[in-house]
């Protein structure tokens, strides 16, 4: 665990002081910190920064497996148990009854339910 925390990490920038990412929030609750060597504005940039480095990017297994299929990346279990990440669909109230928007929300929900792993509540 100490090696993991001391290693160089790629981390997304905090949304705001009171709105940090899942990893930082969880570590803070455990009174732990990690070495945030590279801070990025766009989460999707991180996997492309990793090949050829010893940088660590802590993400969900599903996300890691997707990028390991297209980039030379190693997936290693974290020595710290992180909570299950919950994803939500949010939309403006004026789109609530839009047929095309309802279709898209249904499609996204069906795709999520068809994937292995923890399911939404």
What are the language-model segments listed below?
Residues 63, 73-117:
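A late-sequence structural motif
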Residues 4, 48-51, 89:
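Hydrophobic residues within well-ordered alpha-helices
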């Amino acid at each position: 665990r100490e090696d993991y925390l001391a290693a160089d990490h790629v981390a997304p920038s905090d949304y705001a002081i009171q709105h940090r990412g899942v990893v930082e929030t969880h570590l803070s609750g455990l009174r732990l910190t990690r070495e945030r060597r590279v801070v990025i504005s766009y989460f999707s940039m991180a996997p492309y920064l990793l090949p050829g480095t010893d940088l660590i990017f802590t993400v969900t297994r599903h996300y890691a497996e997707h990028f390991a299929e297209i980039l030379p990346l190693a997936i290693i279990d974290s020595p710290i148990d992180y909570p299950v990440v919950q994803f939500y669909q949010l939309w403006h109230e004026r789109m609530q009854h839009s047929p095309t928007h309802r279709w898209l929300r249904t499609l996204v929900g069906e795709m999520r339910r068809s994937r292995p792993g923890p399911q939404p509540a």
